[in-house]
UniProtKB/Swiss-Prot annotation:
Oligomer status and interactors: Monomer.
InterPro entries documented for this protein: aa-tRNA-synth_I_CS, aa-tRNA-synth_Ia, Anticodon_Ia_Val, M/V/L/I-tRNA-synth_anticd-bd, Rossmann-like_a/b/a_fold, tRNA-bd_arm, tRNAsynth_Ia_anticodon-bd, Val-tRNA_synth_C_sf
Catalytic activity: tRNA(Val) + L-valine + ATP = L-valyl-tRNA(Val) + AMP + diphosphate
Family membership noted in the UniProt record: Belongs to the class-I aminoacyl-tRNA synthetase family. ValS type 1 subfamily.
Chain segments annotated as coiled-coil in the UniProt record: 817-884
GO molecular function: aminoacyl-tRNA deacylase activity; ATP binding; valine-tRNA ligase activity
Name by which UniProt lists this protein: Valine--tRNA ligase
Notes concerning its domains: ValRS has two distinct active sites: one for aminoacylation and one for editing. The misactivated threonine is translocated from the active site to the editing site.
Role this protein plays: Catalyzes the attachment of valine to tRNA(Val). As ValRS can inadvertently accommodate and process structurally similar amino acids such as threonine, to avoid such errors, it has a 'posttransfer' editing activity that hydrolyzes mischarged Thr-tRNA(Val) in a tRNA-dependent manner.
Primary localization: cytoplasm
Length: 884
């Protein structure tokens, strides 16, 4: 097949992906081979591919494709999460378009409509994953509401309940009054909003004075149960134990001592509303207030209700919280107890899906005793059974698990795994895997009603590493698929998903779910700012694929993925790596046009020419480095090593060095030509294999374009470099040649020697080895460095530039070519100008106020400028020193 003149990614991507999938090449079918297992973090079934997914899935696909090439039985489990809230909202919005509401139908009817929606529209993100090139085993695709997966979820709930690790309790939750459900911390978005501090004066019961408290939510004062002061605050020590008469309600509440009160903040006194604030809830418990006795003054829609104390004025009952806020402030003011109102920018919690302010709300929910499950998970990391990469996240992991709270797992939704609990008419809870078992436990004839709530989606997805592999019906450990080999995840779900998988895996499988946990950062805009739709700076990965191809996007994400850092995604980088793909395309096309064909040998061809022995050695060197980079999970080094080898070593040097051989018409060179064509074909094969995990489409296309194959590249064999003969002498000799030519080119460029002008090179008194190389490589040096002639005698007097390579000094005579004095003056002025810029930048970065107040991306930009100035000065000084 003749390689097209122009590289067109769109023309090859869908063709090859369809071929791979139809041929079953993503499915593990290598009996006896070492298994390699990876599970994809399941995206929401409602989702579409965003740039974070593209990063996450590219990093995983690189590992899976590499494992396949290494001969492993690679399985990449793919699937989607049922995404309770998100999916229910999508279906409800669709119903609204046709004038229907969820509440107009029974639960079963609505759930059936969700399944209908999934069948019609739920495959968007999996289709988009295919466009990225993700080599998942689609035959093994899972969904967290599948029958088998649901069986695992129910079994885990019942088992944990029977062990006393799941229980029902009254605690504060993040309550979304619009959706009418508890939500997780990850679904809460903290926004900066313009708010107020209302300062109220609370009178003492005995009339002897008052205490000033400040609040951002004055409506909650209806449920205040105490005022807290710091036990070390001398201003209030005498008041501890006395009572406050709470305005409006006229209820007495105590003044208590608690370290939560900060003497340096405001008045140092804090109103305590345990039923509506997470910190206050803990203060209330420390003060001996039982959750069952904590006052609740809001219903599930955030409307005011009567409290257990029955002291809320009737005019407030039924009002929305914000309407009540206004009236309460007016009442406090009318009582003469409003001290002041202070404008303040505050952090307020909002539901990330509903967009409404979240209420800490006291309610009965189902909880997991996470503290007990966390202990083995902590030990797994401490003992080294799980390695977190980058290691810096280990401290965060410890901090979260050492301070873990009970995990609220119930949600007030219709879509999801319905909690397997049935209640008798007298309120007894019966926990069973199905209704038949529950009825047996309760006794025949006993009326049962099922708990209407569903489980948190994080509860089901925590079982992903083993439930996707058939548990509990099949033992993934017996299949060699558990533990999985590694997990790749965004750092933002370290606690919500990763840690919980570790807890559940250790508890039910008695082993860690993975020995390595790799956490990548965020993909940010080019200026370092966080991407958001409101800023209009989001990047559509599919748009980049349309414009530059999937391979270019994948290589960009790989090259920019540096452990512990966020990615600043600049479209120019994607364009640059598209150019890299084009360079590879043109290089292979050049080889084909010069009669290079397939070389299927796993061993390098016999080679006598130094250039051929050198490229074979460099191929072994890079293959070894790539394996190490993958072992260390250094994606940036992986991409950079390949880029340097393909662009520099292979395209810029090897192809240039062998061009005279390929284009020679002399019969006596036929032996050299055949050897070089054999080596060229073999090296191209190794390049395509090594590059395939990052750039699967272009490599598969070129693999087949070079000639007939008995297998696809995706299942080829990784270079077996350990058995190759490597000529270190050839490596050293060509390295010397490259450094000499590079130095001559740099000198010509820095001193403005006309590119087309050929100049002589003098090498008087150089070491014997250098002299030998100079003679051997004479044709290369003359052609590639634009050298007219090479002389062993000293250079003539006059303007000249000297070049040092190891112990050898070479001279380029430049008399009549450049004005030496003018060139010195130009270089000195350039050095002064750059040093001035460098000094100004150093001064700016040395100013603590600038570093503290400037945007992070501005500070980073200045640091980068400083590095560039330093490099430029070094380069200019080197050019000045070369002038003789």
């Amino acid at each position: 097949m003749t390689i097209d003149k122009t590289f067109d990614p769109a023309a090859i991507e869908s063709r090859w992906y369809t071929h791979w999938e139809e041929e079953g090449l993503f499915h593990p079918e290598r009996p006896g081979a070492d298994p390699f297992t990876l599970v994809i973090p399941p995206p929401n079934v409602t989702g579409s591919l965003h740039i974070g997914h593209a990063l996450d899935d590219t990093l995983q696909d690189i590992l899976v494709r590499h494992a396949r090439l290494k001969g492993k039985d690679a399985l990449w489990v793919v699937g989607t999460d049922h995404a309770g809230i998100a999916t229910q909202m999508v279906v409800e919005r669709n119903l609204a378009k046709i004038g229907q509401k969820r509440t107009d139908m029974d639960r079963e009817t609505f759930v059936n409509k969700v399944w209908e929606w999934k069948a019609e529209s739920g495959g968007t993100i999996t289709r988009q994953l295919r466009r990225l090139g993700a080599s998942c085993d689609w035959a093994h695709e899972r969904f967290t509401m599948d029958e088998g997966f649901s069986k695992a979820v129910i079994k885990v709930f019942v088992s944990l309940y029977n062990e006393g690790l799941i229980y029902r309790d009254k605690r504060l939750v993040n309550w979304d009054p619009h959706l009418g459900t508890a939500i997780s911390d990850l679904e809460v978005e903290n926004r900066e909003v313009q708010g107020h501090f209302w300062h109220f004066r609370y009178p003492l019961e005995d009339g002897s004075g008052e205490i000033i408290v400040a609040t951002t939510r004055p409506e909650t004062m209806l449920a205040d149960m105490a005022v807290a002061v710091n036990p070390e605050d001398d201003r209030y020590k005498a008041l501890i134990g006395k009572n406050i008469r709470l305005p409006i309600t006229n209820r007495l509440i105590p003044i208590i001592a608690d370290i939560h009160a900060d003497p340096e903040l405001g008045s140092g006194a804090v109103k305590i509303t345990p039923g509506h604030d997470f910190n206050d809830f803990e203060v209330g418990k420390r003060a001996g207030i039982k959750p069952a006795d904590m006052l609740n003054m809001l219903d599930s829609h955030a409307r005011v209700i009567q409290t257990a104390e029955n002291d809320v004025p009737e005019e407030l009952i039924g009002l929305d919280r914000f309407e009540a806020r206004q009236i309460i402030v007016e009442k406090i003011d009318a009582l003469g107890l409003l001290d002041k109102i202070e404008d303040r920018v505050i952090q307020a919690p909002y539901g990330d899906r509903s967009g409404v302010p979240i209420e800490p709300w006291l309610t009965d929910q189902w909880y997991v005793d996470a503290e007990k499950l966390a202990q083995p998970a902590l030990e797994a990391v401490r003992s080294g059974k799980i390695k977190i990469i980058p290691e810096s996240w280990t401290k965060t992991y410890y901090n979260w698990l050492e301070n873990i709270q009970p995990w609220c797992i119930s949600r007030q939704l219709w879509w999801g795994h319905q909690i397997p609990v049935w209640y008798t008419d007298d309120g007894q809870a019966i926990v069973a895997e199905n209704e038949e078992s529950a009825q047996e436990k309760a006794g025949q004839g006993v009326n049962l009603r099922r708990d209407p709530d569903v489980l948190d989606t994080w509860f089901s997805s925590a079982l992903w590493p083993f439930a996707t592999l058939g548990w509990p019906d099949t033992d993934p450990k017996a299949l060699g698929r558990y533990p999985n080999d590694v997990l790749i995840s965004g750092f933002d779900i370290l606690f919500f998903w990763d840690a919980r998988m570790i807890m559940q895996g250790l508890h039910f499988m008695k082993d860690v779910p993975f020995p390595k946990l790799y956490l990548h950062g965020l993909v940010r805009a080019a200026d370092g700012s966080k991407m958001s739709k409101s800023k209009g700076n989001t990047v559509d990965p599919l748009g980049l694929i349309d414009k530059y191809g999937a391979d270019a996007l994948r290589f960009t994400l790989c090259a920019m993925e540096s452990q512990g850092r966020d990615i600043k995604l600049d479209e120019k980088r994607v364009e640059g790596y598209r150019n890299f793909a084009t360079k590879l395309w043109n290089a292979v096309r050049f080889a084909q046009n010069n009669n290079c064909a397939v070389n299927t040998s796993k061993q390098p061809p016999e080679a006598t020419l130094t250039t051929n022995r050198w490229i074979i050695a460099e191929t072994a060197k890079v293959a070894r480095a790539l394996d190490q980079h993958i072992e260390d999970m250094r994606y940036d080094e992986l991409a950079n090593s390949l880029y340097h080898f393909v662009w520099n070593d292979f395209c810029d040097w090897y192809l240039e060095l062998i061009k005279p051989i390929l284009t020679s018409t002399e019969d006596q060179n036929q032996g050299e030509l055949q050897e070089t064509l054999a080596v060229l074909g073999w090296v191209i094969d190794q390049i395509l294999i090594m590059l395939h995990p990052i750039m699967p489409f272009i490599t598969e296309e070129l693999w087949h374009a070079l000639g007939d194959r008995d297998h696809d590249l995706i299942v080829a064999a990784w270079p077996d470099y350990k058995n190759w003969s490597v000529d270190e002498t050839a490596q050293n000799d060509i390295d010397w040649l490259i450094r000499l030519i590079t130095a001559i080119r740099a000198t010509r460029s820095e001193l403005n020697v006309p590119p087309a002008l050929k100049v002589p090179l003098h090498s008087h008194g150089i070491p014997e080895k250098a002299a030998h190389n100079l003679e051997r490589f004479d044709p290369f040096i003359k052609r590639l460095a634009r050298i007219e002639s090479i002389h062993k005698e000293a250079a003539p007097k006059g303007a000249a530039a000297q070049i040092v390579v190891d112990e050898a000094t070479f001279v380029l005579p430049l008399e009549g070519v450049i004005d030496l004095d003018a060139e010195r003056g130009r270089l000195k002025k350039a050095i002064e100008a750059v040093e001035k810029e460098k000094t100004a930048t150093e001064k700016r970065l040395g100013n603590p106020n600038f570093v503290a107040r400037a945007k992070a991306e501005v500070v980073a930009e200045n640091r980068e400028r400083l590095n560039n100035f330093t490099g430029e000065i070094t380069k200019l000084k080197a050019a000045l020193e070369r002038l003789m």
